[in-house]
Structure formats: structure tokens, C-alpha cells
């Protein structure tokens, strides 16, 4: 029987209030069907409410942001659907900001990883206003997602969010991420990756040039997941709010096959849960994203992927083995 967490949360003003935003947005990449409905139908929100005793604040909708999609959205700087992704993430940023400003822990269920432009920008702004400090981002993913538009081979914006969020990519057009202001951004020094194993050449160069802390699967194989998480948290520092952005493709396809860009040689589900548990234990978590669950891909593995996603969220929000 699961019981609520006893870990004191340092940066959450409203105790067990959990702001939830469900986002069925797929336009940052080519595969439709990236949607959190399977997670919700599997009982994830009920588990968080009944077992972990969260006071859930959710509007009951899965937001697609279809009403914000422009009639014409030609490529810009190589980006595909830039106005669509910009409009959706700007709206999501406002939603996350409202929850975080009220002092709630925020959970966003995606959606492809382009939505992090919205979630992280909203959390960063709220934390600056409410606490007067910068937050850190722990990005758990097979991919670095820090391509600048001109460096991207695909043009898919789900491979670019961290370039915009760190200010390494900018655009002056309001309808193409020009709405991002300094208080929406994070410092590259406050970004840590875990689980990388498919990183583009230009991204490797950016990581080196800007001294961004990154732990690949090589590091996990060498040191073990426990030591890697220790080093990641030490880099961030003890008194720093944490936004955890978890792409389910960080897990090996054995555990999460129903995702758009699976890469073999990834985390086990237990390693993924350990990362989430360890971040919860710090008491510093202020927001979490779970993204790239797509039950329409590898349909035979859809239930396995959904179970894995639910486990990662529960672990980050205080579920324990004992």
C-alpha cells in the first residue's frame, strides 16, 4: 500500500497541491498521437490523488491548442511549423506559470518534447518572481534537444527546445518564440543531462563550448546510476529548485517501445525510477514533464510504455518501494 511522501518540499508553498496540465500536442515532430490520454486512462491521476494524497488541480482537458494553429505556417530558418509550436508553447507557458506562481508543484503530461519550451519557461518565470532565484533543469533523454534551427538536420522543433530556453537560439519574431523573455530562460550552467546516447555533432560542440554538464549512458555504465545522480545533484547545488523534464525515450525500448525516436542501449525502468526518486528526495522538485509517450506507435508495447510512464511520475512525486 502506497502512502504519501514524508519528504519536506523546500520550494512548494501549497503543500500537496499538484497543478496538472495535460497536453496532446505533436507538432514538434512528425508522428501524430503523442498524447497523455493513455496515462490518464490508466489511472495515473487517481493514483496520485488516492495513494499519494495529492490535491489535484486539473481542468479535465487534454489541450491540443488547435485553436491557436495559424492558417499558414511555412518553414522559417529550417524550422517546421514554427508558428504553431510557438503559439502552443506560449499558451502552455502561461498555464504552467499560473500553477507555479501559486506555489503548486506542477506536472505536465505531454505531448512531444517541444512542449518544454512552454513548461520550463513558465516555471522559470514563476520561480524568479516567487522565490527570487534561478532554477535548474534536469533533462533525462536519449537526445540533447539543443539544436539551433540552422544546425538541425530534420527541422523538427522537439530537437531544439533547450537551444531556445538557454538563449543559444533566438528569434525576433513574436510569433516564432520572440515572446521568450530573459525571465523565461535558464542558464546553461543550471542544465544537467542524464541518459544521452544519440547526440548530433553540432550539439556536442555546444555542450563543450558552454560547459554544459552531461552524463551519457557511457557514464552510467562506468559509474552506476547512483553515482551519476549524485554528481548531477552536486553540480546543481542543494538550494536550487529543480524542474525535471523526462522523455520516455531515455528508457531502453525494451521498457518504453511506444515513442517516436527510440534508441537502443538506454536506461532500465528501475534506473529511470531511481533518478525520479532521488530528485524527489532532495525536496527541491518544483515541476516535472513526462513526454513522448505515443501509444499509436509499436501498439503491442503501448501498455508497457504507459506503465513505465506512470511509474516514473509516481516515483518523482514520492512513491517508494518500502
Curated annotation (Swiss-Prot):
Pathway(s) where this gene product acts: Nitrogen metabolism; urea cycle; L-ornithine and urea from L-arginine: step 1/1
PROSITE patterns: ARGINASE_1, ARGINASE_2
GO process annotations (BP): arginine catabolic process to ornithine; urea cycle
Sequence positions that bind substrate: 143-147, 154-156, 200, 261, 292
Catalytic activity, EC: 3.5.3.1
Taxonomy, superkingdom: Eukaryota
Protein name: Arginase
Underlying gene: ARG
Amino acid at each position: 500500500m502506497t502512502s504519501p511522501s514524508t519528504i519536506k518540499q523546500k520550494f512548494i508553498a501549497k503543500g500537496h497541491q499538484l497543478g496538472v496540465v495535460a497536453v496532446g500536442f505533436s507538432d514538434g515532430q512528425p508522428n501524430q498521437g503523442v498524447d497523455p490520454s493513455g496515462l490518464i486512462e490508466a489511472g495515473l491521476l487517481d493514483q496520485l490523488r488516492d495513494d499519494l494524497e495529492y490535491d489535484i488541480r486539473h481542468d479535465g482537458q487534454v489541450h491540443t491548442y488547435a485553436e491557436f494553429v495559424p492558417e499558414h505556417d511555412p518553414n522559417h530558418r529550417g524550422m517546421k511549423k514554427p508558428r504553431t509550436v510557438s503559439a502552443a508553447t506560449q499558451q502552455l507557458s502561461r498555464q504552467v506559470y499560473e500553477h507555479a506562481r501559486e506555489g503548486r508543484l506542477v506536472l505536465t503530461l505531454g505531448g512531444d518534447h517541444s512542449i518544454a519550451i512552454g513548461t520550463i519557461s513558465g516555471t522559470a518565470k514563476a520561480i524568479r518572481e516567487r522565490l527570487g532565484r534561478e532554477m535548474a533543469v534536469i533533462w533525462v533523454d536519449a537526445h540533447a534537444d539543443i539544436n539551433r534551427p540552422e544546425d538541425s538536420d530534420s527541422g523538427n522543433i522537439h530537437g531544439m527546445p533547450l537551444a531556445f530556453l538557454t538563449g543559444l537560439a533566438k528569434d525576433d519574431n513574436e510569433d516564432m518564440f520572440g515572446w521568450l523573455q530573459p525571465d523565461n530562460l535558464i542558464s546553461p550552467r543550471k542544465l544537467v543531462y542524464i541518459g544521452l546516447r544519440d547526440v548530433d555533432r553540432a550539439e556536442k560542440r555546444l555542450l563543450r563550448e558552454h560547459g554544459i554538464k552531461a552524463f551519457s549512458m557511457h557514464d552510467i555504465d562506468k559509474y552506476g546510476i547512483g553515482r551519476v545522480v549524485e554528481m548531477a545533484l552536486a553540480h546543481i547545488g542543494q538550494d536550487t529548485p529543480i524542474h525535471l523534464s523526462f522523455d520516455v525515450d531515455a528508457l531502453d525500448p525494451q521498457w518504453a517501445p511506444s515513442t517516436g525516436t527510440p534508441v537502443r542501449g538506454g536506461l532500465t525502468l528501475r534506473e529511470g525510477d531511481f533518478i525520479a526518486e532521488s530528485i524527489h528526495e532532495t525536496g527541491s522538485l518544483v515541476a516535472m514533464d513526462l513526454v513522448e509517450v505515443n501509444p499509436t506507435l509499436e501498439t503491442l508495447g503501448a501498455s508497457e510504455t504507459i506503465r513505465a510512464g506512470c511509474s516514473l511520475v509516481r516515483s518523482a512525486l514520492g512513491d517508494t518501494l518500502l
